From Swiss-Prot:
GO molecular function, one term: alcohol dehydrogenase (NAD+) activity
Identification of the protein by name: Alcohol dehydrogenase
Residues given in the record as NAD(+) binding sites: 10-33
A single BP term in Gene Ontology: alcohol metabolic process
Reactions catalysed according to its record: a primary alcohol + NAD(+) = an aldehyde + NADH + H(+); a secondary alcohol + NAD(+) = a ketone + NADH + H(+)
Enzyme Commission numbers on file: 1.1.1.1
Binding site for substrate: 138
Database matches in Gene3D superfamilies: NAD(P)-binding Rossmann-like Domain
Taxonomic placement: Eukaryota, Metazoa, Ecdysozoa, Arthropoda, Hexapoda
Name of the encoding gene: Adh
A Pfam family that the UniProt record links to this protein: adh_short
Subunit structure: Homodimer.
Protein origin, superkingdom: Eukaryota
Positions annotated as active site in the UniProt record: 151 (proton acceptor)
Family affiliation: Belongs to the short-chain dehydrogenases/reductases (SDR) family.
Amino acid sequence: MSLTNKNVVFVAGLGGIGLDTSRELVKRDLKNLVILDRIDNPAAIAELKAINPKVTVTFYPYDVTVPVAETTKLLKTIFAQIKTIDVLINGAGILDDHQIERTIAVNYTGLVNTTTAILDFWDKRKGGPGGIICNIGSVTGFNAIYQVPVYSGSKAAVVNFTSSLAKLAPITGVTAYTVNPGITKTTLVHKFNSWLDVEPRVAEKLLEHPTQTSQQCAENFVKAIELNKNGAIWKLDLGTLESITWTKHWDSGI
């Protein structure tokens, strides 16, 4: 899929991986890049505009933990402004297993709520045009970092939720896939808390192993968006992009 003249809404598009991905996206000659994030970063927005002045870059403050009704209201404003949204990227995430409720609220519930809200506009059963959802998971959604089971569990939930969305595409007209970064050098992983402090040095130990840069991750992130494969589970690790085949151990039969 060419991203030329597409309208993309990027939740958390100013974070570590998020900002580098936004930089790559504007190079693709989008029509609009709408960034929703908790904290404004005028310098980053100005940089994105300077990279490609042909792309309209807009920022709206957004906390993914707000009720669905508030998200729907914000999306209504965005649709009124740019008329169509082609791709929604759900990228909000925190890594801190001391904050159990917030980890689940940001990493999973917020993603589900944002998705639910945009279906109000996209669902073909309501006359909508359909759309594409790219959800950011993590390799911990396949195999946990067991010292951070809350974070890992939230990312496993993202993978399963998104796989379900993909199978619902014939009904809703909305396709979906996950991009799942491996350990990436961002502020997220430099220091974080394990669950019940089971491993106080978890961040330090993790960074002893091979990692990738956020730029490497961002480049493969955008490649995955361009490949636009419904139901794909993409692994973005050590500068590579790989489609994961999920092993089926059970089937509902419906």
